[in-house]
Amino acid sequence: MKIHEITPKDYTDLHRLYCQLEDDWTSDIQDMIRVLEEVKDDPHYHLVGIFDDADKLVGTITLSKCLDLTAKARFYYSLENLVIDENYRQQVYGQALMQYVEDYVRRHNGRYVNLTSSIHRTDAHEFYYRIGFPRNYTVGFKKNVVDD
């Protein structure tokens, strides 16, 4: 298994993974690529993939560097869109990807990681608890400001 940043050659497989993440996810691959191109050179955004021994993309996570002036004026990292291919779940891929993220955050002087997950993804929540995310720590809110 290998973990590294997603490259343009991985975009089709990345789109396939995102289709597994949400049943109603309808983003066109070209829309996804357009957004990725907008942030590709921004050092605060990282799109990381985990690959099996055959170099197939089997999981991904988005990692964003954020500022928290109330936390000893240090940075934290926001984790979004963690998805492991449904045929590779309950193996080591999710845990390995999250360990990579924790190591990355430590190396880059991050104080903590903040993770969001859709409320209905209870299996994912159990995974997060098992790897050390505390229960009932915060409540998150999301408000759409544009009607799609």
In which residue ranges do the predicted regions lie?
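Conserved beta-strand in the GNAT
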Residues: 49, 56-65, 83
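A short beta-loop-alpha structural element at the N-terminal edge
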Residues: 1-14
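Conserved acetyl-CoA-binding loop-helix of GNAT-fold acetyltransferases
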Residues: 84, 90-103, 130
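A conserved beta-turn-beta hairpin within the catalytic core of GNAT-like acetyltransferases
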Residues: 68-79, 89, 136
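A short helix-loop-beta-strand connector motif used in the catalytic cores of GNAT acetyltransferases and
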Residues: 39-49
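Conserved GNAT-fold acetyl-CoA-binding loop/helix
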Residues: 15-37
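Conserved active-site alpha-helix within GNAT-family acetyltransferase domains
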Residues: 95, 107, 119-137, 143
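Conserved GNAT acetyl-CoA-binding A-motif
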Residues: 98, 105-117
